[in-house]
């Protein structure tokens, strides 16, 4: 009986650690139809570091149908996207803009990119939007980052 207790306790600990690590590692896909595969991502404020991986599951090149992942306060995302269009290639983001909390480079079909960011910059219950800054994509390619 003791062995069963310890086996269950160990399994429970491993499962809770796996669940915790999954909220510190995020994955999102983008496609040639100007879509992310989710409208909502969740992250734990307690994470020391968050790793986000963007995978472009389409086939078109970055100069035709490039995608990136950008995080900002919801109140800033449209202005950042518009400034990014003016900034142009390769990443369609204004350089050194403090409103950008995290961002990947623009990638093309079949590529993936990962970044790490510090969730200490974020507030539990804050209003955060992720989006693609490739020209015109932010209108369709956006979603919420929920900090728990």
Model-derived segments and spans:
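Positively charged n-region of N-terminal signal peptides that target proteins for export
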Residues: 1-4
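Bacterial N-terminal signal peptides
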Residues: 6-14
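Sec/Tat signal peptide C-region and signal peptidase I cleavage site
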Residues: 15-21
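Extracytoplasmic/periplasmic copper-protein system
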Residues: 22-31, 75-93, 135-148
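N-terminal edge beta-strand
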Residues: 23-49
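Beta-strand cores of secreted/periplasmic/IMS beta-sandwich domains, seen most often
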Residues: 40-64, 69-71, 114-123, 127, ...
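Mid-chain, structured segments of secreted extracytoplasmic proteins
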Residues: 60-61, 65-108
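Extracellular/periplasmic metallocenter environments
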Residues: 102-148
């Amino acid at each position: 009986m003791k062995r069963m207790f310890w086996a269950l306790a160990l399994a429970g600990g491993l499962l809770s650690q796996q669940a915790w690590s999954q909220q510190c590692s995020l994955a999102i896909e983008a496609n040639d139809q100007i879509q992310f595969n989710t409208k909502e991502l969740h992250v734990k404020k307690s994470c020391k570091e968050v790793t986000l991986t963007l995978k472009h599951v389409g086939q078109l090149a970055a100069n035709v149908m490039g995608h990136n992942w950008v995080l900002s306060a919801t109140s800033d995302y449209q202005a950042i996207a518009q400034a990014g269009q003016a900034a142009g290639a390769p990443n369609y983001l204004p350089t050194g803009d403090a409103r950008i909390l995290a961002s990947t480079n623009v990638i093309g079909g079949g590529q993936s990119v990962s970044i790490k960011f510090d969730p200490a910059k974020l507030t539990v219950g804050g209003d955060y939007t992720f989006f693609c800054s490739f020209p015109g994509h932010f209108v369709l390619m956006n979603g919420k980052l929920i900090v728990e």
